[in-house]
Amino acid sequence: MTGSILRRAPLLGVAGLVVLVDQATKLLAASQLADGRIVQLLPGLINGQLVHNTGAAFSLFRGSVQWLGLLSLAVTTGLLIWVVRHRTPPFWQGMAVAFLLGGTLGNGIDRWRLGHVIDFLALVPINFPIFNPADIAINLAVLCFLVDLWSSRTSSRHG
């Protein structure tokens, strides 16, 4: 079992880094933007604006904190079991799992600890829901899964 976990250390390290960046930036945003202030982070592109989201992505299922907290716990547990029980995954699949694990855990920590998710990244040029680093990681997971799917189909055709 120890060897299995050690082989997964890079995957778990990426997930841990996602959680660390997510929680640290949320803590900073909560302290610096609590008064309703909007701060330019990347002028003309991204502003910092604090929002407490009691829903999921795009504020879907608003007010369903307990249900979403249980869902986060179930997904996190399922991913951890998958990581430990399965062989070392191909690169893109491993990155997808790492980003999904880190993003799910990052937002899950907020739900369990605060009763809402801290969102604070607002895209300036378009009207888009405010988001956070965990959301970015979850979207990167989808992208990595698609790249893995594409690369495995390409290699099966040519190999």
Swiss-Prot record:
Chain segments annotated as coiled-coil in the UniProt record: none
Record pathway: Protein modification; lipoprotein biosynthesis (signal peptide cleavage)
Residues annotated as transmembrane: 64-84, 89-109, 130-150
Keywords: Aspartyl protease, Cell inner membrane, Cell membrane, Hydrolase, Membrane, Protease, Transmembrane, Transmembrane helix
GO biological process: proteolysis
Class of the enzyme per the UniProt entry, highest EC level: hydrolase
GO MF: aspartic-type endopeptidase activity
UniProt superkingdom: Bacteria
Membrane topology, as annotated: Multi-pass membrane protein
Reactions catalysed: Release of signal peptides from bacterial membrane prolipoproteins. Hydrolyzes -Xaa-Yaa-Zaa-|-(S,diacylglyceryl)Cys-, in which Xaa is hydrophobic (preferably Leu), and Yaa (Ala or Ser) and Zaa (Gly or Ala) have small, neutral side chains
InterPro entries: Peptidase_A8
Keyword tRNA-binding in record: no
Cellular localization per UniProt: Cell inner membrane
Active site: 119, 135
Family: Belongs to the peptidase A8 family.
Function per UniProt: This protein specifically catalyzes the removal of signal peptides from prolipoproteins.
Name of protein: Lipoprotein signal peptidase
Gene behind this protein: lspA
